[in-house]
Amino acid sequence: VQLGTTGDQLATEYEQNDGSTVERFNKGADAIQALKQGKIDCVVIDYNPAKAFVEKNDDLQILDEELSSEEYAMCVNKDNSELTAKINEALTQLKEDGTLDAIVSNYIGDEAGQHPYTSPEGVDRSNGTLVMATNATFEPYEYYEDQKVVGIDPDIAQAVCDVLGYVLK
């Protein structure tokens, strides 16, 4: 299991309740390597990263039964309610106009790779810079490609910055 994830919390419950042994890894990819080398019996990881690993490794499969479901969110300093409201408004707009669905479908499903997000021409970025923090090891949400952080989360963050007039760093 990847250290510090929801999967880690779930695996810890199993470890405490039925005596299972949980191996923790800094990256999901390290856990997958250990699985392929026969060092561990399974990997607990989110569905979409699991799907990405299975697509690259014919000898792996995803179990039919889900352990849990969860939702994701952006974190903003709780003292910055103005920015929180602006981001929420931008996300609502992006959901309503189909941008969020298009971003997700570019990474997940039958249309993967067919809808890359590109910023609209002429965006005024005079409102400053928003900084996104991530570990970029959680494909398709965020990962490195050609030494650049890419994925669903960076594309959504860029789309939010496009709506709000910020530079994304």
Question: How should these model regions be labeled?
Answer:
Residues Q9-E13, A29, A34-S68:
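A ligand-binding cleft/hinge motif common to bilobed small-molecule-binding domains
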Residues Y14-D18:
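Helix-loop-beta element that forms the nucleotide-linked donor phosphate-binding surface
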Residues V22-Q37, E70, P154, K169:
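Short helix-initiation/N-cap motifs at beta->coil->alpha
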Residues L3-T6, K51, A73-G113, P154-Q158, ...:
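Extended ligand-binding regions for polar small-molecule ligands
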Residues V22, D64-E65, D101-N106, L168-K169:
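Surface-exposed patches in mature extracellular/periplasmic domains of secreted proteins
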Residues R24, K86, R125-K169:
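Extracytoplasmic small-molecule ligand-binding "clamshell" domains
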Residues V1-T6, S20, T129-T134:
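Short loop->beta-strand "edge-of-pocket" segments that line small-molecule binding or catalytic clefts
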Residues Y47, K51-E89, E111, H115-S119, ...:
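Periplasmic-binding protein-like
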